[in-house]
């Protein structure tokens, strides 16, 4: 036996989680539904590696001179830096650029997979999480952006989220850029200040207009005493930005009219408003006008969005960690990123896409009761009598017969006795167990114990003697009738579950 001091401590790295069977099944069930919708829209699957050359991630890294800042990086044997992918979009850009001549344009693809962030973990903030993306590369007009929004709406409804419980919110970075240009923040020299303005607007849902006003100005002091320095805009500029965020009207047409008034005279802003008007017409033509909303407060934080931006928001209330009722909020978003593939090509390559946060959407569906995997049935367990090694072949045949009939089954392969085997079957959520002792074998029979029915009856029989004598939920059948008998038990349990779920 190893010395106690030499024992390695089993510990999960911070910011990572283990996933148990129910979580895995729920995720696969959800992603299978998403794939069905994306396939219906004519998108094709593609998969890129978890690792990319660090320079392929480019400006999406917080600091290119410190490759481990923000991403997990290591050096190859040729001293080139490699990184675990930060998102699914930058790898797609590399893939498209590398295969540009052979791919159909527009290139419509979807992919899901793990992404990694080398950031400080916290509640609900992980270093590894799954995304599900769809992108169209090579389509310059806003019909591709509108399609992304419509596809997201269809996806949420296919997953069981009702109309009225979600909204796809749409804005256009060109409109905001027009506003920023109008207040004197044009050009690369004002990039940092523009980013501060974007971050302030992004806090609109959290802090409200007055909180954003403070963040656009000198700064905001929160309840804990922490001070966040503001963008230092003059009052007139603050009013202009707030007028932009408050331009939402009773419907899309009114919102667009309000935005036209805000950006009047600015060519870039007017171009953005026209793109929103074109998208609104497509939403109306497709019957999505009540599901997709033009909303000037949407500001995606990533710098590479160049035109329309969109966000999928769930509108129902949930209880947060402090016991407060809050709106669930965003489960995904995206937009147009015309500059991303162009980095590799040296020519304009328009692109647009949408990314779903898989874990967050799973949480939402569980809250709504739309992702129940409790109907997953454990395996039928064929028990092995103590030290009965010479009849293992017979037990194995029972398992094989059940599997051939499409029934999940396993033979107990541990070294414990019957009591421990029954406990094992219970932990495996087995619907029933199969038992064959020497007497049953001589008679060509097996015993089948319905564990679900047994649990129910055990609550009704309080007398141990009666329990032992009655052997509730246990039947004896001919060995060649095993499959049919097990199927009857499984069918009865399925009917009971269906009845209970009504």
Swiss-Prot record:
GO terms for molecular function: ATP binding; histidine-tRNA ligase activity. Pfam families: HGTP_anticodon, tRNA-synt_His. One of its GO terms (biological process) is histidyl-tRNA aminoacylation. Keywords: Aminoacyl-tRNA synthetase, ATP-binding, Cytoplasm, Ligase, Nucleotide-binding, Protein biosynthesis. It catalyses: tRNA(His) + L-histidine + ATP = L-histidyl-tRNA(His) + AMP + diphosphate + H(+). InterPro entries: aa-tRNA-synth_II, aa-tRNA-synth_II/BPL/LPL, Anticodon-bd, Anticodon-bd_dom_sf, His-tRNA-ligase, HisRS-like_core, HisRS/HisZ, HisRS_anticodon. HAMAP family: His_tRNA_synth. Homodimer. This is Histidine--tRNA ligase. It comes from Brucella suis (strain ATCC 23445 / NCTC 10510). The gene is hisS.
């Amino acid at each position: 036996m190893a010395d106690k001091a030499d024992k390695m401590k089993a510990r999960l790295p911070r910011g990572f989680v283990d996933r148990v069977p129910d979580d895995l099944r729920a995720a696969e069930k959800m992603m299978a539904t998403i794939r069905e919708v994306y396939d219906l829209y004519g998108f094709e699957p593609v998969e890129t590696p978890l690792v990319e050359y660090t320079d392929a991630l480019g400006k999406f890294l917080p600091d290119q001179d410190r490759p481990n800042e923000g991403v997990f990086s290591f050096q190859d044997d040729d001293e080139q830096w490699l990184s675990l992918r930060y998102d699914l979009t930058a790898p797609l850009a590399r893939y498209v650029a590398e295969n540009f001549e052979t791919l159909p344009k527009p290139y419509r693809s979807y992919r899901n997979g793990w992404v990694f962030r080398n950031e400080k973990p916290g509640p609900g903030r992980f270093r590894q999480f799954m995304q599900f993306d769809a992108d169209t590369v090579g389509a310059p007009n806003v019909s591709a952006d509108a399609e992304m929004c419509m596809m997201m709406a269809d996806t949420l409804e296919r997953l069981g989220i009702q109309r009225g419980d979600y909204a796809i919110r749409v804005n256009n970075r060109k409109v905001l850029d027009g506003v920023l240009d109008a207040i004197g923040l044009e050009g690369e020299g004002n990039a940092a200040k523009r980013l501060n303005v974007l971050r302030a607007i992004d806090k609109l849902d959290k802090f409200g207009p007055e909180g954003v006003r403070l963040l656009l100005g000198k700064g905001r002091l929160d309840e804990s005493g922490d001070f966040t320095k503001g963008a230092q805009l003059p009052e007139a500029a603050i009013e202009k930005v707030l007028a932009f965020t408050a331009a939402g009207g009773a419907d899309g047409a009114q919102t667009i009219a309000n935005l036209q008034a805000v950006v009047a005279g600015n060519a870039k802003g007017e171009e953005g408003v026209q793109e929103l008007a074109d998208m609104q017409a497509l939403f109306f033509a497709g019957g999505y006008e009540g599901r997709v909303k033009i909303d000037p407060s949407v500001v995606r934080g990533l710098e590479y969005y160049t035109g329309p931006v969109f966000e999928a928001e769930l509108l129902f209330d949930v209880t947060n960690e402090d016991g407060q009722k809050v709106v669930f909020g965003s489960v995904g978003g995206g937009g147009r990123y015309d500059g991303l593939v162009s980095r590799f090509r040296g020519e304009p390559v328009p692109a647009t896409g949408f990314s779903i946060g898989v874990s967050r959407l799973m949480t939402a569906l569980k809250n709504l009761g739309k992702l129940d995997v409790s109907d997953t049935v454990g395996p039928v367990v064929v028990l092995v009598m103590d030290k009965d090694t010479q009849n293992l072949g017979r037990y194995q045949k029972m398992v094989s017969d059940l599997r051939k009939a499409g029934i999940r089954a396993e033979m107990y392969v541990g070294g414990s006795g019957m009591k421990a085997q029954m406990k094992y079957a219970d932990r495996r959520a087995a619907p029933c167990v199969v038992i064959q002792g020497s007497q049953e074998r001589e008679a060509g029979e097996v015993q089948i114990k319905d564990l679900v029915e047994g649990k129910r009856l055990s609550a009704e029989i309080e007398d141990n003697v009666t329990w032992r004598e009655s052997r509730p939920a246990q039947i004896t059948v001919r060995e060649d009738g095993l499959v049919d008998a097990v199927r009857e038990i499984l069918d009865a349990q399925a009917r009971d579950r269906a009845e209970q779920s009504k």
